[in-house]
Amino acid sequence: MVTVTFQIKPYLAAYMYVRYKNHLDVPPDRFSSSLSAIHLLDTQPIYHFLHQLSIPHPPNASWHETGNITFTLPHPRNGKNPNVYNYIGHDSALIIEKAMEVEMKAELYEFLLENKYCHGIMFKKSMETFVEHYNMVGLVEEESLMRAFQRWRKMVKEEKKLNLSLIHI
């Protein structure tokens, strides 16, 4: 089992560890400072990002990994050998971080809309519930997530209006 550790936004690391708590290779040892590795299935998009973005360890890079999230590298039958391709560079980590953010926001937006329109729960209360569930309290401002959600809703509504106006032409 080859692992890779890198730094991402703290709230995304908290989200990933709760979201994939059933996919942890080793439960956290209270006496160890190392993080448990998340072992993703090949049906999850981030698995493929890890596989495609892993490169051989550069000779000038330190072997001491630092960061706030650890993954078990994919070990497909065909393709890259994780014993050789075991390094995620800074630019690759940013790409993976963006994929995690997209996954988190998709889940958040679906949660907010479902709670509002199926259960009558206000967006603010749903946002608090989501942030608490994923241990992101104090790591991210709920207001910034809410503003991003409102921008997304506005964009979707404008696209819908545009598509409807094109149909009538």
Stretches with model-predicted labels:
Residues 148-161:
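Short, basic alpha-helical nucleic acid-contact segments in DNA-binding proteins
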Residues 99-118:
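Positively charged, polyanion-binding regions of nucleic-acid-associated proteins
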Residues 131-144:
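Short, basic interhelical loop/turn and adjoining N-cap
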Residues 114-134:
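Short, charged amphipathic recognition helices of the HTH superfamily
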Residues 86-105:
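Basic, short loop/linker segments at the boundary and entry of helix-turn-helix/winged-helix-like folds
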Residues 49, 107, 111, 126-130, ...:
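Charge-rich, solvent-exposed alpha-helical interaction surfaces
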Residues 167-169:
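Conserved small/polar residues in nucleotide/adenosyl-binding loops
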Residues 1-88:
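Long, low-complexity interaction regions most often at the N-terminus
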